[in-house]
């Protein structure tokens, strides 16, 4: 760890909040592969941007092929993957944006660390359990990953040969086999409004 770095003062969070007219937070979507996390994240990002609110989505496409391209899928690498995502997401939240993350993030301890990281910085962290029965996720299987996992082609696949630890007390619990993508995005939006993280835009 570098020890010769000086932390330079910057705009305070409250000053940024006043200038941008919105609070920052991290919306952390967690759930099985094919549960609908990325689809909901895209819909939520579009909804917020259409209302002239600052939002940015972090997912496998812009993390695994860039910042975390050196990581595999061992438990150690998964932990480091989530640690880095937590740090980046915190930076977006600190800039008074709604940072939307959509990762399986299967281990409860990693998600708790992400929450603690935000709490220590005085930033809001909203954990959302994107829930779907395993059999429904397997029926969806848009990338054919469950099929490969069942065949043994993919090792350590969450939900099949590796564990998924469901949140115990998420801020929101969405059943995507019972609600549409649009309904899920709207529920999250209303939560952010009700918690006074963002202002309601018509």
Curated annotation (Swiss-Prot):
Its catalytic activity? adenosine 5'-phosphosulfate + ATP = 3'-phosphoadenylyl sulfate + ADP + H(+)
Q: Where, by residue number, does ATP bind?
A: 31-38
Which example biological process does GO assign this protein?
hydrogen sulfide biosynthetic process
InterPro entries cross-referenced by the UniProt entry:
APS_kinase, P-loop_NTPase
Listed Pfam families: APS_kinase
Pathway of action: Sulfur metabolism; hydrogen sulfide biosynthesis; sulfite from sulfate: step 2/3
**Keyword check for Phosphoprotein:** yes
Give the keywords, sorted. Answer: Amino-acid biosynthesis, ATP-binding, Cysteine biosynthesis, Kinase, Methionine biosynthesis, Nucleotide-binding, Phosphoprotein, Transferase
* Molecular function GO terms recorded: adenylylsulfate kinase activity; ATP binding
- The entry's active site is 105
**Superkingdom classification of source:** Eukaryota
Which EC number applies? 2.7.1.25
Q: Which residues cross the membrane?
A: none
PANTHER family documented for this protein? BIFUNCTIONAL 3'-PHOSPHOADENOSINE 5'-PHOSPHOSULFATE SYNTHASE, PAPS SYNTHETASE, ISOFORM D
Q: What does this protein do?
A: Catalyzes the synthesis of activated sulfate.
Q: Which family is it part of?
A: Belongs to the APS kinase family.
What HAMAP family does the record point to? Adenylyl_sulf_kinase (MF_00065)
Q: What is this protein called?
A: Adenylyl-sulfate kinase
Organism field: Saccharomyces bayanus (Yeast)
Taxonomy of the source species: Eukaryota, Fungi, Dikarya, Ascomycota, Saccharomycotina
